[in-house]
Amino acid sequence: MAETAKTAVLQEETRIFNTPQWIIEYSNSYQWMKKKGFKTEKEMREWCAQNYLDFWDEMAQTYADWFKPYTQILEWNPPYAKWFLGGKCNVAHNAVDRHAKSWRRNKVAYYFVGEPVGDTKTITYYQLYQAVNKMANGLKSLGVKKGDRVSIYLPMIPELPITMLACAKIGAIHSVVFSGFSAGGLQSRVTDAEAKVVVTSDGFYRRGKPLPLKPNVDEAVQNAPSVEKVVVVKRVGLDVPMKEGRDIWYHDLVKDQPAECYTEELDPEDRLFILYTSGTTGKPKGIEHAHGGFCVGPAYTTAWALDVHEEDVYWCTADCGWITGHSYVVYGPLCLGATSILYEGAPDYPDIGRWWSIIEEYGVSVFYTAPTAIRMFMKAGDQWPKKYNLKSIRILASVGEPLNPEAYVWFRNNIGGGQAPIIDTWWQTETGCHVIAPLPMTPEKPGSVAFPLPGFNTDIYDEDGNSVPLGYGGNIVQKTPWPSMLRAFFRDPERYMKEYWQMYWDIKPGTYLAGDKATRDKDGYWWIQGRIDDVLKVAGHRISNAEVESAAVSHPAVAEAAVIGKPDEVKGEVIVAFIILKEGVQESEDLKKDIAKHVRSVLGPVAYPEIVYFVKDVPKTRSGKIMRRVIKAKALGKPVGDISALANPESVENIPLIV
């Protein structure tokens, strides 16, 4: 068996958490299963995998509205897929127009909650429809046409989804750039996309202070010759320079525009957006997604995995600068006609109870966030959520990285009242929607993402293209295409082929390599182990970084952990752990030894961290992923490379030199 298959599971999670029967029976997926006559969840998942074209056809008919029906579900010429051939659609029609012209016209689409306490706004579907139409007409007045790119560099304010939807409506391609990126990060993305227009704001709020954003755009577009216009939202009232002939205020652009705008009837393969992935060196990867797939994948998974219903108040805390914001703040919930929270600010401003106060005030019933936030709340203590009434919560969900078992238990008990299932989701910018996740009916193992969702043929391969046995790990692959899959890298077909399809091309052409690895335990539950290159090689054993980190976090004094391998002449690598302690815990040499012993007791001697450091923070992306590449480079005295994607670049200095 190839070496990747030898990444064995060191620890078996035996705890099972079952969902209350009323939540199961209420869930969208359970009701579909019963309607179809399946007796078990396993039977349903297997049928949907084997009959994936029939399944996706039904999802496309259920969750999307088509101007013209498609005549062919899929044309698959690996590595290129075309879905819903012959049809006509537009995701803006599905997300906004059809609701504004139905009984939902006065239903709330977004409760906007600004960072300043009390800065709130309610936006109905009809109001959203009018705002999108005005902005769409505004963009057209600036010369934006079908296929043109529009870069969006905004904080989490209503104008962000409005501009995304306005682009979609007229067939323009949006490219959202996270507002935390510097001018350099923005410039590379605007230049690569050849954006005609950039939409930004004067500034944004961070922990109560208005900070400028527009100057980053001014700097970035100096070296972006494609940019003709810059549209500026007046958010914080800062005095910013406006370049005559190029810059225009958002409110001036839209104020006299008609509140009606024709929605382009598009081919399902027409591009909806380009989103640049970050965190690696070199040129950013512009991942292309299409209208047809985004009319289906995010809506289906919002309904099935997150179990969002008509009467729910749903909150995904992600920023729209990332794929989670695209799929689960904008397109998924809006295509369902759901009511969502749109929150601008930090999770702990003005205090660490801010999110819980929003859940209490708005009666949030489905709450989707990231492990890094959950661990931050754990560190602050149980007393904070206890101050608030969180009984409205029915479903919890997690995204961004594996949710370690201790954080799972804390989240379920303290936020979910010991009742709410936690939908721990694995997916990627490239997949467009959830791929592996429990359904509300799934018995859950803390730390596991359970099973591939209905409609996906997902497997774990060794390097020779063999499906690995239970108890072993390897590379996550997709054996068949799916509607919301990436269509290409923007103007880089060679990289697209090399990165995702080349690995198994000679053995099983059309096999998608995700770049992440996973294991399956004896019960078939999936455990995400991080990136393919995130593996420790200790004395001939291959050990997952994530598994060692999870063991460290199960120590009562530890809030968060990151581990790397340090080269060693004898063992190949020795394990080095960087530990963030819980509030009030005192650092000591004895505690370092105790944490190392604890990891050994949980995972065995092979996983013993020979070196333990206490740090205040570790480098993470804005989506909460620990940047082990950066930690390892800094610790070993090597160049750290591109750190523009870090949420906390100052944390790099916390990492000591260990050579």
Swiss-Prot record:
UniProt enzyme class: ligase
InterPro entries named in the record: Ac_CoA_lig, ACAS_N, AMP-bd_C, AMP-bd_C_sf, AMP-binding_CS, AMP-dep_synth/lig_dom, ANL_N_sf
Cofactor(s) the protein requires to work: Mg(2+)
UniProt xrefs under PROSITE patterns: AMP_BINDING
Binding site for CoA: 206-209, 324, 600
Keyword Chloroplast: no
Tagged with keyword ATP-binding: yes
Single annotated GO MF: acetate-CoA ligase activity
E.C. code: 6.2.1.1
Reaction catalyzed: acetate + ATP + CoA = acetyl-CoA + AMP + diphosphate
Membership in a protein family: Belongs to the ATP-dependent AMP-binding enzyme family.
Protein name in UniProt: Acetyl-coenzyme A synthetase
